[in-house]
A protein has these predicted regions:
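TRNA-recognition modules of translation machinery and tRNA-sensing kinases, especially anticodon-binding
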Residues: 1-190
Length: 190
């Protein structure tokens, strides 16, 4: 029953946003993409979570979420460096939500992308990534879609497909899984 429901949602979305939309085209981009795509988009440098471990109970937490919870949303950790987040957690004595203690490891950046390699010779392999989102495939294939469809700007590209994230705490229902479906539609305008 679940797969039928999911497929119905995908079909309805595709029909509404791709087939019934004027000047909109569908795409099925690659799941494995060259590392240069992710470097150019900034993903290799910044698609990570700031993680801290509680030394007492060994639980792992996102530093930004600890700050948001402690400040009740009045502090924006997105504009803070790791050092500033550590300083806030220390100065405001932010405790572990599991055990209540205040004994943290330093923040470490946890890479959210799955990395693998392509090639048969070990010393000549190229690094590639499983896509953490589908949007980059739409951007990379913009000219291919425009040329093959003779589309004039503005036009849209829609895609339904799997994305993969190296979640540190998978299993938080449907929100923090390592493999999931995305439905994205990008509009390209002047």
């Amino acid at each position: 029953v679940g797969v039928e429901l999911k497929n119905n949602v995908k079909r309805c979305w595709w029909k509404r946003f791709v087939q019934e939309s004027d000047n909109s085209y569908g795409l099925d981009a690659a799941i494995l993409m060259n590392s240069r795509v992710w470097e150019a988009s900034g993903h290799t440098a910044s698609f990570s979570d700031p993680k801290m471990d509680c030394k007492e109970c060994k639980s792992r937490h996102r530093a930004d979420q600890l700050i948001e919870a402690h400040s009740h949303g009045t502090v924006n950790p997105d504009v803070m460096t790791n050092e500033e987040m550590e300083q806030y957690i220390e100065e405001h004595h932010v405790n572990c939500p599991i055990c209540g203690k205040h004994n943290w490891t330093p923040i470490r950046q946890f890479n959210m992308m799955f990395e693998t390699s392509r090639g048969v010779v070990e010393d000549a392999k190229d690094k590639i990534y499983l896509r953490p989102e589908t949007a980059q495939g739409e951007y990379v294939n913009f000219l291919n879609v425009q040329r093959t469809t003779r589309a004039k700007i503005p036009f849209g590209i829609g895609q339904v497909g799997k994305a993969f994230r190296n979640e540190i705490t998978p299993g938080n229902f449907i929100f923090r899984t390592i493999e999931f479906e995305q439905m994205e539609h990008q509009w390209f305008c002047k």
